[in-house]
Every structure is written in C-alpha cells, then in structure tokens.
C-alpha cells in the first residue's frame, strides 16, 4: 500500500512516518523544506533515535520525497495514487495543503479508495481537513468523492524534544507514543498500522490525552515558572510543584473515570506513566516553551478551563490556573498581552474575555478567590 505524508518535520519523520514504514507502506513525504526533501531523496532513509537511556537508533527507509512548492504535478499524482494520506503540519497549515489534496482527489481513479488522517494536536483534525478540502470541490465532486474518500479523526501523542543534529534528517523521539484512530471514519478496509489503536469512539481518548498530558504539561510549566525552575523535569522533581500537577491530574482523572468508564487503577497507572515522561531527562523542555501561548491555553475549552468547568470543586487545577494567569514571560507575545489585559481589566476581565467565564459561574469565583489570596 502507498502512503503519502504531508510534513517531513521531526514529528512526521520520527513518529508517523516511522510507524507507516514499519507497517510496510511505500512511503512518500511531501514538504516545502528544500534541504530536507533533497536529502531524503539523495539518501532514501533517515535515522530515528529514542530519547531514553541507551539512545537506541533505527534506520527508516526506503522513502522518497516531493517538494510540494516546486513540483505540484508530482504531488497531484502522489495524492491520486495513495491508499493512505497522513499529515503532521500543524493545525493552521491544514487549510493550506487542502487545495493540493483536492486537486489530487479530482485526478484519482473514480473507484480508488483513499483514507486521509490528520495527525495534529487538535480535536477533529481530519474533519477540519475534510471541510477545507471540500471547499475546493464542486457539489457533484463532493458527492462522488464521499463514496471513496474517508477522513477518520485521530488523537496523537508523542513528545519530540527541541533538538539540533549535524545530520538534518536525524530525529530524536521519546519511547512512548499513542496514535488512536476512529475506525468508523474509514472507507473500505481499515489499514494495518503497527502501534496504532483503532476505536469506535475517539472522544474518551482525546479528552484523556488533553486533560492528562496537555493539562499536566501546562501545569508543570506555569507552576514551575512561578517557582523559578527552568525545565519540566525540574518542575516535577520539585515536591510542591509535583503535588499540584499530580493533584490536578487526579481531579481530571475522576471526571474521566466517571464520564467514560476508565478503570481507576488503569487510569492511575496512566497518570504515573505521564509523570514519568515529564521526568525523562532526554526530552525535558524549558518551562517557557511549554507555557507559551497562555491566551490559547486558558481558552474556555482548552486544557485548563475546559476540565475545570466539568468539576464541582477542583482545588489543584485552580492553583495551576492561577499560575497561568500570572504568567509574564517577556519574550512570549501572548504572555505580554495577557498581563496587559490583566492590568487594564483585572482578573475579572481576563476570566470573562479569555476564559469565557461569567461572575455567576462557581469556577469564576473560585479562581478569583485563589488569585486574590
């Protein structure tokens, strides 16, 4: 089977591309990074290193690559002939690649089945991509392609640390990964992908990841910054910070267990697995990188306010939210805007305009109380 992957960056090569190649796919990357594309075509393979003791390496290949900016005709042909298309380009870029995908779909054999999976850090990535692709098609084309093109949603999780290598193709990734795909979104047979998990309902896994990995990472960053530590590992190694992180994850865990039926002992083990990932010295990020974009992360449905709204009386989560509201790293544009808004309109203004809360909300009052202690 043929797989076309949009995005030859570290996540594309080190996570999605690696699994697809291990699963036996004929793999083609497409990207606009000329140096990476040229090197992939020259060598036909690349190295993936596990960011863990021993730093085990594997060679991924053979692979080929297409420069989407310089060779749109080759990209159209690659889309049309692919059995599986995946992306790791960032949510904002999906609408940019949509026109290229649409052009390829129009050129494919009418009976040829293609499934397209957006592997982005967002909810409903494939659905968003479908909407963007279909905006380039006529109603007649949309109707016809809906019979042969699937857009199954997915949840992905793997930390790829900031890294610099002499070899521009080498990529380091953490050993842990999770790629969960909604099997009900496929047209035709569900492909065999080693390491991927196929489920009937993706929502529990999306929320479990968002409210555990993303929430925990953010809390370690914001509380860590507040306490003056430099890295996520330092944060979770500091008892008072770890107490807030673990406490909040058990709060979100209670919601996840009650709502989706996860077994308590299994979810508790999942929390500890996530904490251990944060402790990994090989992938420890600076708190200021993980904390960046606080306005987005304090959004009504994001990793902090989102789970807090679903609970009656969160304690540790509110401590973390208070730390996020105080985040003032001068080199972070959103942090500067956040503190400007806080100075002009107070915490009340931030809670209403950024967090989507109102004074009648219990959470609004609880956060207000925590920030004015």
From Swiss-Prot:
One of its GO terms (cellular component) is cytosol. It comes from the Bacteria. Its EC number is 1.1.1.17. It catalyses: D-mannitol 1-phosphate + NAD(+) = beta-D-fructose 6-phosphate + NADH + H(+). GO terms for biological process: mannitol catabolic process. Keywords: NAD, Oxidoreductase. It is an enzyme of class 1 (oxidoreductase). NAD(+) binds at residues 3-14. SUPFAM superfamilies: 6-phosphogluconate dehydrogenase C-terminal domain-like, NAD(P)-binding Rossmann-fold domains. The keyword Transmembrane does not apply. GO terms for molecular function: mannitol-1-phosphate 5-dehydrogenase activity. Pfam families: Mannitol_dh, Mannitol_dh_C. Belongs to the mannitol dehydrogenase family. HAMAP family: Mannitol_dehydrog. This is Mannitol-1-phosphate 5-dehydrogenase. The gene is mtlD.
């Amino acid at each position: 089977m043929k797989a076309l992957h949009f995005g030859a960056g570290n996540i594309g090569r080190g996570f999605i591309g690696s699994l697809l190649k291990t699963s036996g796919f004929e793999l083609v990357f497409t990207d606009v990074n000329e140096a990476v594309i040229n090197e992939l075509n020259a060598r036909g393979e690349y190295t993936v290193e596990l960011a863990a003791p021993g730093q085990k390496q594997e060679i991924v290949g053979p692979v080929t690559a297409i420069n989407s900016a310089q060779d749109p005709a080759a990209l159209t042909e690659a889309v049309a002939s692919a059995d599986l298309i995946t992306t790791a380009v960032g949510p904002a870029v999906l609408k940019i690649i949509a026109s290229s995908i649409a052009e390829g779909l129009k050129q494919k054999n009418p009976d040829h089945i293609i499934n397209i999976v957006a592997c982005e850090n967002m909810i409903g990535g494939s659905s968003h991509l479908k909407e963007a692709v279909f905006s380039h098609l006529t109603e007649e084309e949309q109707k016809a392609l809906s019979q042969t093109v699937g857009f199954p949603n997915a949840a992905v999780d793997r930390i790829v640390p900031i890294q610099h290598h002499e070899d521009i193709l080498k990529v380091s990734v953490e050993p842990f990964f999770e790629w969960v795909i909604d099997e009900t979104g496929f047209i035709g047979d569900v492909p065999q992908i080693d390491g991927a998990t196929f489920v009937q309902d993706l929502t529990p896994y999306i929320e479990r990841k968002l409210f555990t990995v993303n929430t925990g990472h953010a809390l370690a960053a914001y509380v860590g910054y507040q306490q003056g530590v430099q890295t996520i590992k330092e944060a979770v190694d500091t008892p008072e910070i770890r107490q807030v992180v673990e406490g909040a994850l058990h709060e979100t865990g209670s919601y996840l267990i009650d709502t989706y039926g996860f077994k308590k002992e299994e979810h508790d083990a999942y929390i500890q697995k996530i904490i251990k990932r944060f402790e990994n010295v090989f992938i420890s990020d600076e708190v200021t990188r993980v904390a960046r974009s606080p306005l987005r992360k304090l959004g009504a449905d994001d990793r902090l306010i989102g789970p807090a709204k679903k609970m009656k009386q969160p304690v540790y989560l509110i401590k973390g939210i208070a730390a996020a509201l105080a985040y003032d790293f001068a080199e972070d544009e959103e942090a500067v805007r956040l503190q400007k808004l806080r100075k002009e309109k107070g915490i009340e203004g931030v809670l209403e305009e950024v967090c989507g809360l109102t004074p009648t909300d219990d959470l609004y009052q609880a956060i207000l109380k925590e920030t004015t202690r």
